[in-house]
Curated annotation (Swiss-Prot):
Residue intervals of the LIM zinc-binding domain: 21-83, 85-147
InterPro entries: LMO_RBTN_TF (IPR050945), Znf_LIM (IPR001781)
Subcellular location: Nucleus
Protein's UniProt name: Rhombotin-1
Record field: transmembrane: none
Any Gene Ontology CC annotation: nucleus
Gene transcribed to yield this protein: lmo1
Amino acid sequence: MVLDKEEGVPMLSVQPKGKQKGCAGCNRKIKDRYLLKALDKYWHEDCLKCACCDCRLGEVGSTLYTKANLILCRRDYLRLFGTTGNCAACSKLIPAFEMVMRARDNVYHLDCFACQLCNQRFCVGDKFFLKNNMILCQMDYEEGQLNGSFETQVQ
């Protein structure tokens, strides 16, 4: 997926007295001590919003996406311009805005990212093995190795 632009919302320092900027959202002068800048325009904190859902994007640390001169939140950007795919475990569609897990070229719903033999869900830091597009926990992988069922590489 290619973004036109993804940017953090910079909170600019105190603006110089006598040189107040105009807000691109409401066209009023920004009299606040701080102002925001996005798409090379200045905004009140309350005026910088997603063009689709009107959620506020002016909070410190928030990220906004721009495409075709629209300012969007992550969810709406992915809904409008993101790509969807199918889960490698259940084959159901994964919406573009949904969080996923990846193992090589495979993409999984978070709930589907589990050993496909014993259904043990993986936690951060757990070892897992990928064999014939199946995700295996360490115990099932080692059991398969002892039985001579398969060989694969550690992920």
